[in-house]
């Protein structure tokens, strides 16, 4: 399924049954169950023998301002995504959003105090509204070498390696889980955040093209 449609974090048997029925309604006859791995979600992009990008993917969340309801802030967020040309798979009526709001003791009509964070998705993904936090300048040598070794073992010149870890900037933190290796990683995760980030994405693609020309 694309854009994380039909992907759910299940906390108990009852939720599992509900989610299974939702997936079946999408005419899917195959279920993939995966063990939940705790930690933060990172992607490390390798080009040749170098890490050119590393960032943390944060689940979609909103921050209270003391006067707007969760529903109002959510709709404003979705509207801003669409105005910027960001993927429209961010849907304010997504049942997973309602579940997360309720899990934290709120409703759509709740007004959060200024600075209070309400997580709306469990999944840390750009297509579901999640922001990113750049770690390229801070990733530890341990995780750089790990990512490069993985890419080389698969004979991939360009790839994105998805890792769950507590902190890829801490060289002493070596507890991690490899989620996925993507042989065609997108590099435009910052492009919606401003002109400076847009220029950064263009530089990344220039690096890739220069590398390919020299092969």
How would you describe each model-predicted region?
Residues 47-49, 58-62, 67-70, 163, ...:
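Generic preference for flexible, low-structure residues
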Residues 1-95, 140-145:
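Active-site nucleotide/adenylate-binding loops and adjacent lid/helix of ATP-dependent enzymes
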Residues 34, 161, 179:
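Active-site flanking residues adjacent to catalytic metal/cofactor-binding acidic residues
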Residues 3-8, 53-55, 97, 101, ...:
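Generic hydrophobic/packing signal
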Residues 132-141, 152-156, 165-215:
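C-terminal active-site "lid" helix and adjoining low-complexity regulatory extension at the edge
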Residues 26-27, 78-169:
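A long amphipathic alpha-helix within ATP-dependent nucleotide-binding catalytic cores
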């Amino acid at each position: 399924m694309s854009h994380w449609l039909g992907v759910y974090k299940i906390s108990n048997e009852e939720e599992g049954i509900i989610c299974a029925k939702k997936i079946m309604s999408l005419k899917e006859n195959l279920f993939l169950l995966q063990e939940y791995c705790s930690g933060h979600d990172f992607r490390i992009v390798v080009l040749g023998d170098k890490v050119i990008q590393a960032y943390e993917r944060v689940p979609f969340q909103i921050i209270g301002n003391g006067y707007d309801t969760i529903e109002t802030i959510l709709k404003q967020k979705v509207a801003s995504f669409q105005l910027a040309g960001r993927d429209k798979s961010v849907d304010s009526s997504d049942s997973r959003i309602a579940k997360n709001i309720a899990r934290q003791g709120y409703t759509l009509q709740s007004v959060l105090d200024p600075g209070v964070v309400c997580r709306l998705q469990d999944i840390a993904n750009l297509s579901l509204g999640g922001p990113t936090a750049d770690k390229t300048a801070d990733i530890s040598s341990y995780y750089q070498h790990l990512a490069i070794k993985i890419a080389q073992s698969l004979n991939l010149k360009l790839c994105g390696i998805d890792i769950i870890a507590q902190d890829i900037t801490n060289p002493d933190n070596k507890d991690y889980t490899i989620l996925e290796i993507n042989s065609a990683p997108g590099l435009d995760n910052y492009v919606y955040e401003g002109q400076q980030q847009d220029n950064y994405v263009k530089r990344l693609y220039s690096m890739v093209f220069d590398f390919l020309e020299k092969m």
